[in-house]
Structures are given as C-alpha cells and as structure tokens.
Amino acid sequence: MHFFVRKYRGKAALLSIGTFDGYKIYNCDPFGKCFHKIQGATSIVEMLFSTSLVALVEKDDGNNRKLKLINTKKSTTICELTFPTPLLAVKLNRKRLLAVLEEQIYVYDISNMLLLHTIETTSNVFAVCALSPNSENCYLAYPDSRDHEPRTEGESSSPNVSNSAVSGQVILWDVINCKQITKIEAHKDSLACLAFNSDGTMLATASDNGRIIRVFAIPSGQRLYQFRRGSLPAQIYSIAFHPDSSLLTVTSSTQTVHIFRLKEVYSNLERQGLLPSSPPPKESLLRRSSRSLIGTVGGYLPQSVSGMLDPERDFAYAHIPGDKVTSIAAFGPDNTIVNVATYDGNLYSFRVNLRTGGECAMVNHFCVGLTAA
C-alpha cells in the first residue's frame, strides 16, 4: 500500500493500494475510487504525483522481480524491467525512478528509463530509504552499513525485528549528479524510517527503537529538531511532513498518530500570515519560507547544542480505532486534515486544531476494499 498526498494544480489526495487481484487508486477528498485494474496480485503501486504514470510490481510466481511502468489513462505499458533479485520498493519523482533491491538501488532517468547508476548498499531487507519529491533538491537517503559498534545503554531494547546490517547513519546521495553528498549520524539503532519534506530541504529519521524522531537540514546534515514519540519502544510505520514543513506526522505500532510542530518554521509562517488555516498562498512563497528557516534554525541550534536539548513531545495526536495494524499517514488536501490508511483496508481522516493541538477529532472513515497484497 502506498499513500500519496500532494498539491498539484490545486489540491489532490490520492491513495493507491496493491491487492490480491490487482490494484486500486482512490481520491480521498471527496472520497471515491478513481481507478481499478483487475490483474495478478500486486505488491507495489507507486504513483508519479497525481499523474497517470504508475509503477507496478506484480507478485509473479512470488518472485517480485518485474517492474512495469503503466499509463493508466491510455491503459498502455510504457516499459518492463526485470531485476536479478526481488524488488522491495520503487521511488519516483519527475526526474528519477529508483528500484530498491535488498543490496542495490538502481537509478533511472524517468524521461527515457535509461539506467544511470547502480548503488551497492548493505543488506536492507526493509527497503529503508527516501527520495526527495523535489526535482531541484533531488536527493536519496538510505542507511549506511553497520560497523558493529557497541550500542549505548537504552538504545537496545527495541521489540522489533532489526534490520541488523543497517546502521543509524544516513547516506545522502545526489541522484541528478550520481554522487554521495554527506553522511548523517542520525541514531545509534538501525534506521527504520526516512522521509523528506516537499522541498527536499529537511529529512526526518527514526530508528528501530522508535522513541526519538529527528529532523535534519539538507544537504548540510545539521540537526534541527528532536521529538519524543513515547517512553516505550515502538515500530515506526510512516513519517510525513506537512506541505509547508510546519508539522510532522508519525504512525507506529502503538495505534497513536503523533503530530509534531516544527516551531521555528511554524512561527515564521505565522508572522507572514502563511499558516495552513489561512487562504492557501502560492507554493513558491511556502517553499521560500521553509528554505529560509533552514538556515535560521541551524544558526540557533548548532548540533552540539541541539543534541543536549530534551526532545519535545507531540503537539497533537489521534487514536486509530480497532486492532493494531500497520498504518501510513499524510496531510490531506485542506492542510488541517491528517489522512491515515491502514493495511486492513480503512481510511480515517482526523482534523488538527492548529492553534491548540491536543486530540484530533475523527471527521471521516471509509472502507477502501480488499486488504493490500
């Protein structure tokens, strides 16, 4: 299952789901199914923003080695690629398509599907990586290999199955020029989740421990924020930035959706009258605002100081009903809504009070059909 939300020619919110008999694409607001293809079981469905271009990985005899690039509007297959080992993830933006295998990442020019580079990685069985959605700040983040360093006290009590070959260090890679930019010391435990903001100027990280969420400036790697999800370990399922980078939402195995406020960004937007509750400004203004704050925050919080500060708790939160199940979240089209999709086929919408925070009210609940394959 893949959950995708982005402003594109207005506002859009799309949810794509791979199922045992094909795949579906839903519009979240207003809710409705906008595409359904009956075929074999589909394990990966990735959309290029709100376009008709979709990357699919079918469960072909269980090997998951074939990638198809589909135009859903024309019902045509643009290309097919077969890989030596199973595909674990596919990432794409307007410039690049990445095919993620356990020990390689293939980098393609999406305009002609020419293979540009193959990155050799450590064994990354959970495909922990992120591709910036921004075509100018076009970066890939993925884990460095673990050097078997001893863990510090309090960092080894995670109840989750660890991606043990993966370290807590992030490699930042320029996928336009095909070169490594820097390494970021993010966590002691193995990395579990990575996410860029819409501009590619911030990177959020979480480890297998799941207690701490950190945000770094990109490409410098300067630590900007540190948030505490909870006092007990948990498995982090997803991280997503608000479109203007003022908020961050996190889902985990606790069934609580945490929403953190990036205070310096939020305060700057408030001064400029660019808060999400205001009439939506031009995207370029939001981008300039969030970019300018990167330098400002970095100036106030050098890494040696920010590492000593107590992590902040969530600003707002929501509870997912029912049994514990894997979930993913993203901010909805009116920017005060957090949409949460669960792997048992439910879509929940929660409203965030941007002034007071606290518990978010559920405003919608829809069933999105079959459980994802």
UniProtKB/Swiss-Prot annotation:
Q: Where is this region: Disordered?
A: 142-163
As for what it does, the entry says: The PI(3,5)P2 regulatory complex regulates both the synthesis and turnover of phosphatidylinositol 3,5-bisphosphate (PtdIns(3,5)P2). Necessary for proper vacuole morphology. Plays an important role in osmotically-induced vacuole fragmentation. Required for cytoplasm to vacuole transport (Cvt) vesicle formation, pexophagy and starvation-induced autophagy. Involved in correct atg9 trafficking to the preautophagosomal structure. Might also be involved in premeiotic DNA replication. Required for the recruitment of the atg5-atg12/atg16 complex to the preautophagosomal structure.
| UniProt protein name | Autophagy-related protein 18
Cross-referenced SMART domains, in alphabetical order?
WD40
- Recorded superkingdom: Eukaryota
Spell out the residue ranges that the record assigns to WD repeats.
Answer: 144-183, 186-226, 231-270
The disruption phenotype is:
Impairs atg8-processing.
**One MF term in GO for this entry?**
phosphatidylinositol-3,5-bisphosphate binding
**GO biological process: one example:** macroautophagy
Which InterPro entries does the annotation name?
A: PROPPIN, WD40/YVTN_repeat-like_dom_sf, WD40_repeat_dom_sf, WD40_rpt
PROSITE patterns noted in UniProt? WD_REPEATS_2 (PS50082), WD_REPEATS_REGION (PS50294)
Output the Pfam families linked to this UniProt entry.
Answer: PROPPIN
For this chain the motif L/FRRG motif maps to: 227-231
Which UniProt keyword terms apply here? Autophagy, Endosome, Membrane, Protein transport, Repeat, Transport, Vacuole, WD repeat
Q: Tell where it localizes.
A: Preautophagosomal structure membrane; Vacuole membrane; Endosome membrane
GO cellular component terms given for this protein: cytoplasm; cytosol; endosome; endosome membrane; fungal-type vacuole membrane; Golgi apparatus; phagophore assembly site; phagophore assembly site membrane
Q: What is known of its domains?
A: The N-terminus might form a beta-propeller domain involved in specific binding to phosphatidylinositol 3,5-bisphosphate (PIP2), leading to the association of the protein to the membrane.
The annotated topology with respect to the bilayer is:
Peripheral membrane protein
Does the record's keyword annotation contain Transport? yes
Where does this protein come from, organism-wise? Schizosaccharomyces pombe (strain 972 / ATCC 24843)
Q: Self-association or partners: how does it assemble?
A: Component of the PI(3,5)P2 regulatory complex. Interacts with atg5.
Effect annotated for changing R229T: Impairs localization and pre-autophagosomal structure formation
Q: Where is there biased composition of kind Basic and acidic residues?
A: 144-154
What family is reported? Belongs to the WD repeat PROPPIN family.
Please state the protein's primary subcellular location.
membrane
